[in-house]
Amino acid sequence: MNKNPIYRSEEEAKNIACGNVAAELDENSQALDAINGAGWKQTIVCTIAQGTVGCLVSYGLGNGGYCCTYTVECSKTCNK
């Protein structure tokens, strides 16, 4: 029996507990394509909305106009 799950035959895949790994990966990629296939317009709108919400939360937490991350380099500039 081949140890690489991708290269197993159909008969070998039926005899293992996890089933056909290649078929499962294909199903997962199809599901991700369906989720991510909303179109570029919706993606742009979501990106702008998430950025706006992030800036509003940052401002609400006391950040005076800068959108910063938790990195050490940025934290020093945000505390001014």
Swiss-Prot record:
- In this UniProt entry, the residues modified to 2,3-didehydrobutyrine are 43, 47
Spell out the residue numbers of the propeptide.
1-38
According to the UniProt entry, the cross-link of type Beta-methyllanthionine (Thr-Cys) is at 52-55, 69-74, 71-78
Q: Name one GO molecular function term.
A: lipid binding
Asked if Secreted is a keyword of the record, the answer is: yes
Listed transmembrane segments: none
Cellular component terms per the entry's GO annotation: extracellular region
Subcellular location(s): the record lists: Secreted
* Superkingdom of the source species: Bacteria
- Does the keyword field hold Glycoprotein? no
Numbered residues of crosslink Lanthionine (Ser-Cys)? 58-68
Q: Which UniProt keywords apply?
A: Antibiotic, Antimicrobial, Bacteriocin, Lantibiotic, Lipid-binding, Secreted, Thioether bond
Q: Name one GO biological process term.
A: defense response to bacterium
Q: Which NCBIfam families match?
A: plantaricin
What job does the chain carry out? Lanthionine-containing peptide antibiotic (lantibiotic) only active on Gram-positive bacteria in synergy with Flvbeta peptides, which are encoded by the same operon than Flvalpha.a. Shows antibacterial activity in synergy with Flvbeta.b, Flvbeta.c, Flvbeta.e and Flvbeta.g. Does not show antibacterial activity when tested with Flvbeta.a, Flvbeta.d, Flvbeta.f and Flvbeta.h. The bactericidal activity of lantibiotics is based on depolarization of energized bacterial cytoplasmic membranes, initiated by the formation of aqueous transmembrane pores.
Q: What is this protein called?
A: Lantibiotic Flvalpha.b
**UniProt organism field:** Ruminococcus flavefaciens
What broad taxonomic lineage does this protein's source fall under? Bacteria, Bacillati, Bacillota, Clostridia, Eubacteriales
